[in-house]
Design a protein with these regions (language model features):
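Cytoplasmic-entry segments and transmembrane alpha-helices of multi-pass inner-membrane transporters
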Residues: 36-73, 152-153, 166-167, 175-176, ...
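Transmembrane alpha-helices
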Residues: 57, 130, 136-150, 160-191
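Interhelical loop and adjacent transmembrane-helix boundary motif
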Residues: 3-6, 10, 196-244
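Membrane-interfacial helix termini and adjacent extracytoplasmic/periplasmic loops
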Residues: 1, 12, 67-129, 163, ...
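Transmembrane alpha-helix signature in integral membrane proteins
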Residues: 9-39, 53-54
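C-terminal transmembrane helix and the adjacent membrane-cytosol boundary/short C-terminal tail
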Residues: 141-152, 156, 223-257
């Protein structure tokens, strides 16, 4: 009966939403974390340690405190919307009165209302990226630091420009770090429930919230265990993919997927 309930389209949509949010979180973390790791690795050795310390410093505080900080930033009366509705709206009104020939009426109307940030999927992604970004940066940094810079010089001797050297030499050789960071971000994002509970809304429920409600509110332990098992299987699949990729890379064998 519990597997029949699990086949309900509602839970399938929640699982799909969870995979989507976890994937977006992983991609955004990569787009931010890889350039950050590359920049840190390019700094002098003494400065690298300081930069890594600065990266980790905010994460010495309690996770709930950091999440509540994003509530203060993203809510309708938060920092972003205070600037948006206050300063930017006033600036738009001033420009409209000073330069009436500019088509600013639509922009003035938009800035009159708060941005719908809190209680959305965007808020969840922001919170998750902020929470797991070091897990992307550190593996990428380790892979980039081990990279032999003479290979880039060899590629340039063969008339490769910077972009070609990055695509054909640097990125493939640092890909294990990217894969490791992606797994370290994707797996905890799949099981997240505190961040979507605090930053998300009713339309942004993730599977972690469903598991929590099944155990703590509905007291439906069999169904909660069923969902937990499926989620664990997804996490295990991601972990096995990582190990298969790294072992194939170490043996020098092509990975045929």
């Amino acid at each position: 009966a519990r597997f029949f309930d699990f086949s309900d389209p509602l839970y399938l949509r929640i699982f799909g939403r969870t995979l989507y949010i976890a994937a977006i979180t992983t991609v955004v973390s990569f787009l931010i974390g890889y350039p950050m790791a590359f920049w840190i690795a390019s700094q002098p050795e003494k400065r690298r340690n300081s930069l890594l310390m600065m990266l980790m410093l905010p994460f010495w505080t309690n996770f709930l405190v950091r999440t509540y900080a994003w509530i203060l930033i993203l809510r309708d009366q938060g920092v972003i919307n205070t600037i948006w509705v206050g300063h930017i709206h006033n600036a738009a009104l001033w420009l409209e009165n000073t330069l009436p020939w500019l088509p600013l009426e639509g922009f003035v109307q938009v800035t009159a209302n708060p941005l719908p940030l809190f209680g959305t999927t965007l808020a969840i992604v922001i919170g998750l990226v902020y929470g797991w970004l070091p897990d992307m940066v550190l593996p990428c940094y380790a892979a980039i630091e081990r990279f032999d810079g003479s290979l880039v010089e060899a590629a340039q001797d063969l008339y490769a420009n910077r972009m070609q050297a990055f695509i054909r030499v640097i990125f493939p050789l640092t890909l294990p770090g990217v894969i490791a960071g992606s797994i370290l971000v994707f797996i905890p994002s799949l099981g997240a429930y505190v961040t979507p509970d605090l930053l998300g809304g009713a339309k942004s429920v993730m599977i972690g919230n469903v598991i929590y409600s099944q155990f703590m509110s509905a007291r439906d332990y069999p169904f909660g265990a069923t969902i937990s098992f499926v989620l664990m299987a997804l996490m295990l699949a991601g972990t096995l993919f990582y190990f298969r990729f790294t072992v194939a890379g170490q043996k020098g064998e092509p990975n045929h997927g």
